[in-house]
Amino acid sequence: MATRDSGGGQQRADRRAEEIDDVATEDTSASDLKERHEKLSEDVDSLLDEIDDVLEENAEEFVKGYVQKGGQ
């Protein structure tokens, strides 16, 4: 009786290699996402600080203008 090689062993090895590649890609993507998140967080913090500064200046001007017009 002749045995037939279906090549299943090779296919399993290929799938295993693909799984390893997928895990490596996920790790790379996760680190890229983490770096991007940190950069965006820094940008948002900077923007919020700038907004706070503008609001403080405008609040002082508003109060000065209100008092000059006779407001209490």
Swiss-Prot record:
Annotated metabolic or biological route of this protein: Protein degradation; proteasomal Pup-dependent pathway
GO MF terms held by the record: proteasome binding; protein tag activity
InterPro entries the record matches: Ubiquitin-like_Pup
Keyword Coiled coil: yes
Compositional bias of kind Gly residues: 1-10
Bias (Basic and acidic residues): 32-41
PTM info: Is modified by deamidation of its C-terminal glutamine to glutamate by the deamidase Dop, a prerequisite to the subsequent pupylation process.
Signal peptide region: none
GO biological process: modification-dependent protein catabolic process; proteasomal protein catabolic process; protein pupylation
Keyword Coiled coil: yes
Sites of Deamidated glutamine modification: Q72
Region (ARC ATPase binding): 28-66
Positions of the UniProt region annotated as Disordered: 1-41
Subunit details: Strongly interacts with the proteasome-associated ATPase ARC through a hydrophobic interface; the interacting region of Pup lies in its C-terminal half. There is one Pup binding site per ARC hexamer ring.
Family: Belongs to the prokaryotic ubiquitin-like protein family.
General function of this protein: Protein modifier that is covalently attached to lysine residues of substrate proteins, thereby targeting them for proteasomal degradation. The tagging system is termed pupylation.
Domain remarks in the Swiss-Prot or TrEMBL record: The N-terminal unstructured half of Pup provides a signal required to initiate unfolding and degradation by the proteasome but is not needed for pupylation, while the C-terminal helical half of Pup interacts with ARC to target proteins to the proteasome.
Protein name from the UniProt record: Prokaryotic ubiquitin-like protein Pup
Organism expressing this protein natively: Frankia casuarinae (strain DSM 45818 / CECT 9043 / HFP020203 / CcI3)
